[in-house]
A protein has these predicted regions:
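Beta-strand-rich ligand-recognition modules
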Residues: 3-53
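An acidic-aromatic loop/edge-strand motif
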Residues: 37-92
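Long, well-ordered core segments of solenoidal/helical folds
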Residues: 88-117, 149-169, 211-233, 268-294, ...
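Active-site lining segments of carbohydrate-active enzymes
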Residues: 92-96, 114-118, 236, 241-245, ...
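CBM-like carbohydrate-recognition segments
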Residues: 95-105, 118-124, 140, 156-211, ...
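Beta-strand-rich domains and repeat architectures in extracellular enzymes and scaffolds
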Residues: 109-140
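Structural helix-adjacent loops and short alpha-helical linkers that scaffold large soluble proteins
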Residues: 136-151, 199-217, 261-275, 323-343, ...
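Flexible, glycine-rich surface segments
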Residues: 323-327, 334-387
């Protein structure tokens, strides 16, 4: 029973059309589950339909909490609007211009999607690291299943951004998907995952990657807070405690993305920006006596904290090798970067313990052995050897194998569980915060991907030395 012209589609194919009134029709289909769409065109002053089936029951196309309704509605659209079945049916996209989304048969009752999975389809910095390690592991072992998992994860994040931005505009506040990308106030929110996204696109190919790459690239290059010399720092943050600070790990949150954005766009300015960041951070965070980096510089006190957090230091040299791999040989900052890399690696080498590990507080071996920073030093040392950046490479080869033995002994069990990865950090001028309060988590996503990357680098180093 319809009011006005009505068209019924089953799995995107038109099966029935009427100009209104009560009618019946048959649709013979093999056993299975099918999507049913009804296009209802306003007839006079009213529209609507009733669709009943004698042989099967309808069920909702999505699990919508709080209702038993089986029909959802979307519209209104102009009469000649071509409905995008492929994108609208997955319920990941807004539809039309102006945009709208699915709703129930009640006034202003829109359906609002949620991603309740903490590890799949999520966009955050630790998962960016995890997927990066997983990608190169999948390539190394030739696993199509893992490649497909990574691609599906990242593609879901790309596909839902447009909806998430609309969701925030409609309802305000944090969105139930992409709450970081829709409320960016730091490099943490965008740089790590976007860098990994571009790496996945390079190897596996993704749809519509440019719109997200441009969105993140614009924030990092044009909107992220900078000092007068162009160095990134934290200002006007949601977490006010972070205001007016500079964090060592922000080199990872920015530089790899700038590197890949330069490759993606062909624009040299991103590489120049990446190179300059290291010297701005060095000016504020470098601890020359030990040749390592302080975790944070607090501009409110015009002082660095002088606490060398392990993972923060790991991110510095990790990111430097990402840049040096693609920085042109004639770049004016290249030689200075290589010299800085050698200086830092000398400092880190001196702080390796007898079991091969580096510690949560690098210069305090009474703090716990920390897996993610140990993995990053393996990664940076190996790349420094393979690309010829490190002087006296023999001592670093020895340190790498010693560290990998330490990780194999204490950090990874026979089931692949990863131990000893520090959880997400705040900062302090007091080393005891890192030593006693900032503990580690089992299988923490801040470190699982890094352990995989370290393992890949050990394999690459073996091949390099054999040749």
């Amino acid at each position: 029973d319809t009011k006005g012209e009505t068209v019924v589609y089953i799995d995107k194919k038109e099966v029935f059309k009427t100009n209104g009134g009560k009618e019946t029709f048959d649709a013979q289909l093999p056993l299975g589950t099918y999507d049913v769409y009804v296009k209802c065109i306003c007839g006079g002053n009213d529209w609507g339909y009733t669709l009943e089936c004698d042989t099967v029951e309808f069920e909702s196309a999505a699990r919508v909490k709080g209702t038993d309704d089986v029909w959802m509605y979307i519209g209104t659209f102009v009469n000649d609007f071509e409905f995008p079945f492929d994108t609208a049916s997955d319920m990941l996209h807004i539809v039309g211009e102006p945009a709208t989304y699915w709703r129930l048969d009640a006034p202003d009752t829109f359906v609002r999607p949620y991603n309740e999975n903490t590890l799949f389809g999520r966009w955050n910095y630790p998962l960016g690291v995890t997927m990066y390690g997983l990608l190169h592991t999948a390539i190394a072992i030739g696993s199509e299943d893992i490649k497909n998992y990574i691609k599906d994860h990242v593609q879901l994040c790309i596909d839902t951004l447009e909806y998430a931005l609309w969701d925030k505009e409609q309802y305000g506040g944090a969105t139930s998907i992409h709450n970081l990308l829709t409320s960016i106030d730091s490099l943490d929110d965008c740089g790590s995952f976007a860098s990994m996204m571009l790496e996945v696109n390079k190897y596996l190919g993704l749809r519509d990657v440019k719109k997200v790459a441009d969105y993140v690239g614009d924030y990092i290059y044009n909107h992220q807070s900078r000092l007068e010399d162009g160095t990134f720092f934290r200002k006007e943050m949601m977490h006010h405690f972070h205001n007016m600070t500079m964090w060592a790990e922000d080199l990872y949150m920015s530089v790899p993305n700038l590197v890949r954005n330069s490759q993606f766009t062909g624009d040299q300015k991103y590489l120049d920006d990446a190179a300059n960041q290291f010297f701005g951070f060095k000016k504020r965070l470098f601890m020359p006596e030990e040749k390592i980096m302080s975790h944070v510089y607090d501009f409110k006190y015009d002082s660095k904290t002088n606490v060398p957090w392990g993972r923060g230091n790991g991110w510095v040299v990790f990111s430097m090798t990402e840049l040096l791999e693609v920085l042109p040989e004639d770049h004016p900052k290249r030689n200075d970067l290589i010299e800085f890399l050698n200086t830092l690696c000398e400092g880190y080498l001196a702080l390796q313990d007898d079991e091969g590990m580096w510690h949560q507080v690098l210069n305090d071996h009474e703090s716990y052995p920390e897996t993610s920073c140990t993995s990053m030093f393996i990664y940076a040392f190996s790349r420094g050897i393979r690309f010829g950046w490190l002087k006296n490479p023999e001592k670093y080869v020895k340190a790498i194998y010693k560290a990998w033995k330490g990780i194999s002994k204490t950090s990874v069990d026979s089931n692949g569980n990863v131990y000893g990865v520090c959880r997400g950090s705040e900062f302090s001028f007091i080393a005891d915060y890192y030593k006693y309060e900032l503990g580690w988590n089992l299988n923490d996503t801040h470190g699982t991907g890094i352990v995989m990357l370290a393992g890949i680098e050990v394999i690459r180093l073996n091949k390099f030395l054999a040749e």
